[in-house]
């Protein structure tokens, strides 16, 4: 059965979408079958996968609200070599429409129930807010991966996020776990980065990935070219870091790399 991982943080600009597409591409490069679900109305994961969000025939809105069959919604041609459920502005409307339907919190879970066995990993790019789309992601997921910058107030924000995840788990998914905490945009020359990193390891132990994602120009440039970093510059520090993260995740799952 494929593992479903929600990638979430209530704070924007922490590398959530970057992590989603680059981790997915790295997993796909290890011959795993991967699906990315873009639940962020901005559609950044869609565009960074080389898919024009203005040209797609169907989006996550159709999957969640219209209950369009999965095979009519999924995009199989992406630059990251993973499958994709795209997002566009209409995903914002899904928030309103879902309020009107029965079992609105588990629409995504139900939609994935018949296809999750077709994938090794399903990564969900969540919106940077707590709404019905995020709740659907949490209800469907086995675990939550939290990307976070090593910056001032990071620990305070993380405490609030952990509390939110705990409350959601109690209501919609009692089996939901923390997959791991990922340090992003890390600069080893910055004393604050090192101090926050040390505090994270002190408080959360082995939940903090050993892999660290550095600040990297090529990693930041890649989405504007519609590619994950490994297909934009495979020798960049960012591309190598996400390949290392994929390997670390597989080892945690005791899956041969």
Briefly describe each language-model feature range.
Residues 1-257:
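P-loop NTP-binding core
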């Amino acid at each position: 059965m494929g593992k479903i991982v929600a990638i979430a943080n209530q704070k924007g600009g922490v590398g959530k979408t970057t992590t989603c597409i680059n981790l997915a591409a790295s997993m796909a490069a290890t011959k795993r079958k991967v699906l990315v679900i873009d639940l962020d109305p901005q559609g950044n994961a869609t565009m960074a996968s080389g898919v024009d969000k203005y040209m797609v025939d169907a989006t996550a809105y159709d999957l969640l609200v219209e209950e369009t069959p999965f095979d009519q919604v999924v995009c199989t041609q992406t630059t990251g070599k993973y499958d994709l459920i795209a997002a566009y502005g209409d995903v914002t409307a899904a928030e309103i429409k879902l309020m009107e339907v029965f079992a609105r919190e588990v629409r995504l879970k139900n939609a994935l129930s018949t296809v999750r066995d077709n994938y090794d990993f399903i990564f969900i790019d969540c919106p940077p807010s707590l709404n019905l789309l995020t709740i659907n992601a949490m209800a469907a997921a086995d675990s939550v991966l939290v990307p976070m910058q090593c910056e001032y107030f990071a620990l305070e924000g993380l405490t609030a996020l952990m509390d939110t995840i705990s409350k959601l788990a109690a209501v919609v998914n009692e089996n939901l776990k923390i997959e791991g905490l990922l340090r992003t945009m890390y600069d080893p020359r910055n004393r604050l980065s090192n101090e926050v990193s040390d505090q994270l390891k002190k408080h959360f132990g082995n939940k903090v990935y050993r892999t660290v994602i550095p600040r990297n120009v090529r990693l930041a440039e890649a989405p504007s070219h519609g590619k994950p970093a490994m297909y934009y510059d495979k020798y960049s520090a960012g591309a190598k870091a996400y390949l290392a993260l994929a390997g670390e995740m597989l080892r945690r799952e005791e899956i041969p790399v």
